[in-house]
């Protein structure tokens, strides 16, 4: 039984992670945290998340419950995730990262830590999205040289980063399959008289509206035909169940930097 701590357990995603951990027969809830200023610190996590009293209260720092868990699942914010990364390094814990919006320097810090502890980091934990990443690699190898490639993503009004980590992941899958770095070919905004698009660029468009959980489309457009690969999420439990699956898998792994491709065994597809 893998004991899991949920960072940001009172948030939208955090509550789903608590439920997913509780429902999975191979995991159990060990701890949960919230920001120190939250009025929910000290509240029973189970009662808060609708799974019944668990005898585990929200703490303002997972250091206080470090003996109660094996793996942290963190879908919070970069600064908070890096603090939990340091805690995991210090105490030999494992870390599943669903946070997005890291700088290149912050990502390097995470990759460096993975030399000491096991870490899974992914922009999206749904099985469907990670299958889409593989499909995009194959589509890019076949169509990338002669098609215009655009990525459109939509999320709820509360999402703070753009484009989404999943959209970036889609762009990276396409760019790498074509032998490019995404930073060299990405175009994140167009306005005014932009001139004709170049053939090798990957364009991004972002929508923030209402309560959209997550929709992503990659478009390969030629003259006379267009291929679109789309994923639509309708329930956050999809991501939560995938993250718990990753935590259970990670519990048996040595130190290293892993992705959901590793967790799902998609490398050979």
UniProtKB/Swiss-Prot annotation:
Q: Which UniProt keywords apply?
A: Amino-acid biosynthesis, Cytoplasm, Diaminopimelate biosynthesis, Lysine biosynthesis, NAD, NADP, Oxidoreductase
Q: In which pathway does it act?
A: Amino-acid biosynthesis; L-lysine biosynthesis via DAP pathway; (S)-tetrahydrodipicolinate from L-aspartate: step 4/4
As its record notes, the protein acts as a catalyst of: (S)-2,3,4,5-tetrahydrodipicolinate + NAD(+) + H2O = (2S,4S)-4-hydroxy-2,3,4,5-tetrahydrodipicolinate + NADH + H(+); (S)-2,3,4,5-tetrahydrodipicolinate + NADP(+) + H2O = (2S,4S)-4-hydroxy-2,3,4,5-tetrahydrodipicolinate + NADPH + H(+)
Q: Highest taxon of the source?
A: Bacteria
A GO CC term attached to the entry:
cytosol
Q: Which EC number(s) does UniProt give?
A: 1.17.1.8
| Binding annotation for NAD(+) | 8-13, 34, 98-100, 122-125
Positions annotated to bind (S)-2,3,4,5-tetrahydrodipicolinate = 156, 165-166
Q: What InterPro entries is this protein classified in?
A: DapB_C (IPR022663), DapB_N (IPR000846), DapB_N_CS (IPR022664), DHDPR_bac (IPR023940), NAD(P)-bd_dom_sf (IPR036291)
Q: Where in the cell is it found?
A: Cytoplasm
- Whether Cytoplasm counts among this entry's keywords is yes
**CDD domains per record:** DHDPR_N
For this chain's UniProt record, which GO biological process terms are given?
A: diaminopimelate biosynthetic process; lysine biosynthetic process via diaminopimelate
Molecular function via GO: 4-hydroxy-tetrahydrodipicolinate reductase; NAD binding; NADP binding; oxidoreductase activity, acting on CH or CH2 groups, NAD or NADP as acceptor
What does it do? Catalyzes the conversion of 4-hydroxy-tetrahydrodipicolinate (HTPA) to tetrahydrodipicolinate.
HAMAP family, A to Z: DapB (MF_00102)
Q: What NCBIfam families does its record include?
A: dapB
Q: What is this protein called?
A: 4-hydroxy-tetrahydrodipicolinate reductase
Q: Which organism is it from?
A: Vibrio cholerae serotype O1 (strain ATCC 39541 / Classical Ogawa 395 / O395)
Taxonomic lineage: Bacteria, Pseudomonadati, Pseudomonadota, Gammaproteobacteria, Vibrionales
Q: Which gene encodes it?
A: dapB
């Amino acid at each position: 039984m893998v004991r899991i701590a949920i960072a940001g357990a009172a948030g939208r995603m955090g509550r789903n992670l608590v439920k997913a951990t509780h429902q999975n027969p191979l995991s159990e809830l060990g701890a949960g945290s919230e920001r120190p200023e939250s009025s929910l610190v000290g509240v029973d996590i189970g009662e808060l998340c609708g799974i019944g009293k668990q005898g585990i209260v929200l703490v303002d720092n997972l250091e206080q419950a470090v003996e109660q868990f094996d793996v942290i699942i963190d879908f919070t914010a970069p600064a908070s995730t890096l603090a939990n990364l340091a805690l995991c390094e210090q105490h030999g814990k494992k870390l599943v990262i669903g946070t997005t919006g890291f700088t290149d320097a912050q990502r390097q810090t995470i990759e460096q830590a993975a030399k000491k502890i096991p870490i899974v980091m992914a922009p999206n934990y749904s099985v469907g999205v990670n299958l889409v990443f593989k499909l995009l690699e194959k589509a890019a190898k076949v169509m990338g040289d002669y098609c215009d490639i655009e990525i459109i993503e939509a999320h709820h009004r509360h999402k703070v980063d753009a484009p989404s980590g999943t959209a970036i992941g889609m762009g990276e899958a396409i760019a790498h399959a074509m032998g490019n770095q995404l930073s060299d070919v990405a175009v994140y905004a167009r306005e005014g008289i932009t001139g004709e698009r170049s053939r090798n660029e990957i364009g991004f468009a972002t929508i923030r509206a209402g309560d959209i959980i997550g929709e992503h489309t990659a478009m390969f457009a030629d003259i006379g035909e267009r291929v679109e690969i789309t994923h639509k999420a309708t329930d956050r439990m999809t991501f939560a169940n995938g993250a718990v699956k990753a935590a259970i898998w990670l519990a048996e792994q040595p130190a290293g930097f892993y992705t959901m491709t590793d967790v799902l065994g998609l490398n050979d597809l």
